[in-house]
Design a protein with these regions (language model features):
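Pre-Walker A-like glycine/lysine-rich segment at the N-terminus of P-loop NTPase domains
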Residues: 1-47, 63
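Acidic, divalent-metal-binding catalytic cores of TOPRIM
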Residues: 38, 383-617
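Conserved P-loop NTP-binding catalytic core
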Residues: 42-91
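Walker B catalytic acidic pair
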Residues: 330-332
């Protein structure tokens, strides 16, 4: 069972239009740029769950929009019963549906309050949300005055290893240690001095007596006296407090302790009725010796005491006997090296496979986290052209099964940290190689000129070199009509028609399936380098000289094309030298028409002018 769908309206980014986010399964990564709506989804999940730990910090009521204001969540059973958790199996066994409920969002003393769920408590009583917000403080949670997260870890281990005596044994040991402190001579001397003064002061009315005692040893006390330490070596003596430890490793420790504190809910459903064999029970009762009334009363009192203690422990514990845990982690990449980010994702994915009662949802800005995931686990949150937040599940790509399988295979192969950055982009440029990316960004700066808004656009533009000729991947992944993950995506590709005019170019048939409003090709004829020559002949000639190469005479589009047809190995050296010269002469270069049109369309959707115009800056 897992959280499948979140719908929120009248709150933050959903104030103008509802936000619907669907999740692929028990592991999912929600990614998107700043301001796309991820925080709205995160807080909607937290507000929707009545049973959450730790408590969500108060949210200012200005986050509320016009009515209606509510959040609706829907859980779903696993498609394969082999991967169903204990709670899901129990509900299915009783013929019940997966939980779903709705909560209104209300104002309360200037804060946002989630109202009473509009469903029976049976729907959500066994669902637990563990929320690690972006503004979490691991040092406070693990080592300060109220480290309750450690207490949940102790309770989880008590369930797993009851033979240790659990928290009851730990409290007894702590109480014995504290009581021994009061017998110390120093404490006795202080106690006598205070008691004498109090007797003198209070003797005129009613004499009182003072004693130095210790705190009541309960679970709250245990939460205060424990703290986590971190060491580089497996030696307790070398452990250091978290305040002086690496922030990245403290963040990892926080996640590790939180997950370890989730007890095992079991792998089999809890039976509806306890399997008691009455006959065997009667026979056992007959064979037992008859106890006296006093012994029976004493045994009954002990049972009642144990039952009351167990009830108190259950009330204090966050997790019931049968539950499903939804773990929401915001920005787990905080302070983490990319290698640690990759390992974290792999570990969490393994955890979800091993423990069917846990679902992990993460939100991130990290391309490294996205690269470590399977494409079908990714959810992209973005703004559409109307500034409404939309959520796209990659697994729902509306393509044929064979084509989608092919695209996902290529995505798994190519989705490294560099390419996964494309999933965060609003506008994206696709090129074949890294040299094209470098040259085109420089031409973009020349195109922008002194326009500060255009300069900012070029500097932040995501340029993705795919390392091969631009094909269906990644355009069909990012810009399939009706399922766009970007606002606009442009591809600069070569026609490779060395002896034919540009009008003879025949793009593949699949180009027609792209939405012309969101995806376009711009052609370099016949390749990028020759298409840059017109108006930049002197610069191109200087680039040949910088590479110690003999420039063709004269330098024209045709001669440069023929040169690289016969000397393809010199292309890389030439491109690097040309990029350096462009960077040094931005004010005097000519931007080719197809490149100028490409940047203008990416920038604001402007259509090319009826007559070609080269931007000379």
């Amino acid at each position: 069972m897992h959280l499948k769908r979140i719908e929120v309206e009248g709150y933050r980014a959903s104030a103008n239009s509802p936000i619907v986010c669907e999740l692929p399964g028990r592991f999912s990564l929600i990614l998107g740029a700043n301001g796309s709506g991820k925080t709205t989804i995160n807080e909607a999940i937290a507000l929707a769950h009545p049973r959450s730990f730790p408590r969500l910090a108060p949210i200012d009521a200005t986050a509320l929009g016009p009515t209606p204001r509510m959040v609706h969540v829907t859980y779903e059973f696993e498609a394969d019963t082999l991967y169903e958790g204990a709670l899901g199996a129990y509900l299915k066994r009783r013929g019940l549906s997966a939980p779903q409920w709705c909560r209104p969002l209300e104002r309360s003393l200037g804060r946002v309050r989630a109202g009473q769920p509009l469903k029976s408590s049976d729907e959500y009583d066994s669902i637990r949300l563990v929320h690690l917000p972006a503004l979490r403080n691991p040092v406070d949670d693990l080592s300060r005055r109220d480290a309750r997260i450690l207490l949940e870890l102790l309770r989880a281990d008590e369930r797993k290893h009851p033979e240790t005596g659990g928290l009851r044994s730990l409290r007894a040991q702590a109480e014995g240690m504290l009581n021994s402190l009061t017998s110390h001579p120093l404490v006795g001397n202080v106690e006598d001095r205070i008691a004498e003064n109090l007797r003198i002061i209070s003797g005129g009315v009613q004499e009182h007596h003072a004693f130095v005692g210790t705190q009541t040893v309960d679970d709250t006390y245990l939460a205060r006296v424990f703290e986590m330490l971190v060491a580089l070596f497996p030696d307790r003596a070398t452990a250091r407090r978290l305040q002086v430890s690496s922030l990245g490793y403290v963040n990892l420790l926080h996640i590790a302790v939180t997950l370890a504190g989730i007890p095992d809910a079991g792998s089999t459903p809890v039976p509806d009725d306890l399997p008691v064999d009455c006959k065997e029970a009667d026979e056992g009762a007959e064979s037992a010796p008859v106890a006296g009334d006093d012994e029976l009363a004493k045994a009954a009192r002990e049972r009642l005491a144990r039952t009351a203690e167990a009830a108190d422990a259950d009330a204090d514990s966050f997790y019931p006997e049968l539950f499903h845990a939804t773990v929401l982690i915001e920005e787990p990449e905080a302070h983490l090296h990319p290698q640690l980010q990759y390992g974290l994702i792999r570990n969490l994915r393994s955890l979800v496979k091993e423990r069917p009662d846990i679902q992990v949802i993460m939100t991130t800005h990290s391309a490294d986290l996205a690269a470590a995931c399977d494409p079908e686990e990714l959810v992209v949150v973005r703004k559409d052209t109307d500034n409404h937040t939309i959520s796209r599940l990659l697994a729902d790509l509306p393509l044929s099964k064979s084509l989608k399988t092919q695209l996902f295979q290529q995505t798994r192969l190519h989705l490294d940290a560099t390419r996964s950055a494309a999933l965060f982009a609003d506008r994206l440029l696709i090129v074949e190689g890294v040299t094209e990316a470098s040259i085109l960004r420089l031409f973009g700066r020349a195109w922008a000129g002194s326009d500060t808004r255009r300069v900012g656009f070029i500097d932040s533009l995501a340029i993705l070199p795919v390392g091969h000729k631009v094909g269906q991947w990644p355009l069909r992944l990012l810009a399939t009509s009706g399922h766009e993950l970007v606002t606009r995506i442009a591809a600069v590709a070569d026609t490779d028609l060395h002896d034919k005019p540009l009008s003879d170019a025949q793009p593949p048939a699949w180009h027609e399936e792209l939405n012309h409003e969101s995806a376009r090709f711009f052609w370099s004829h016949p390749t990028l380098e020759p298409s840059l020559v017109s108006g930049n002949e002197a610069l191109v000639k200087d680039a040949f000289t910088e590479c110690n190469l003999k420039a063709p005479a004269p330098v024209t589009t045709e001669t440069v094309d023929q040169y690289f047809v016969t000397h393809p190995r010199n292309k890389g050296r030439f491109a690097l030298a040309l990029a350096l010269l462009i960077d040094q002469n931005l004010s005097s270069i000519t931007v080719p028409t197809h490149i100028s049109d490409m940047f203008a369309w990416l920038y604001d959707g402007s259509e090319p002018d009826s007559t070609p115009i080269d931007d000379v800056t």
